[in-house]
Amino acid sequence: MAGIAQVTQGGPKTFTPADNEVILGGKLVEARAGGRIGIAAAGSTKVLGVALTDALAPEDFPGANGTDALGRPVISAAPVPTSVAVAYGGAEVKVTYSANAAFGDKLVATAAGTVAPAGATPDARTIVGVCTEPAGVVVATKDVGLMRTA
């Protein structure tokens, strides 16, 4: 191949949520059919990164003078986002932890787009990042902490 065009450099990359998916910033997202994304399931091997914004699928956009799936009023002056910026490839972002994690722990996806420390012998495809919260994360006191994406 004589030359190629670079598609992205460092991200984030924008995706459209899958039908009936409510994407919230700070949650892990995974690849879905048709080039769309959804909230990552526990143990997912298709995690793309961390959502930086909230959004709905375009087909789920509510009618005028209603509320969206996030409970926000919908008026013509405040459209609901239908695309999501996703951080990946070494980005450091805040995520929600489902279990306590120490600084430096390798992390895997857990239910509802959250993260937890990997077990002793995880499938390498399930590692989504590293805990970079300096004091670690203690879920009972604060379940949000820093993670560097894989």
Question: Each predicted region: which residue ranges?
Answer:
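Surface-exposed, low-hydrophobicity beta-strand/loop segments enriched in small/polar/acidic residues
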Residues: 1-150
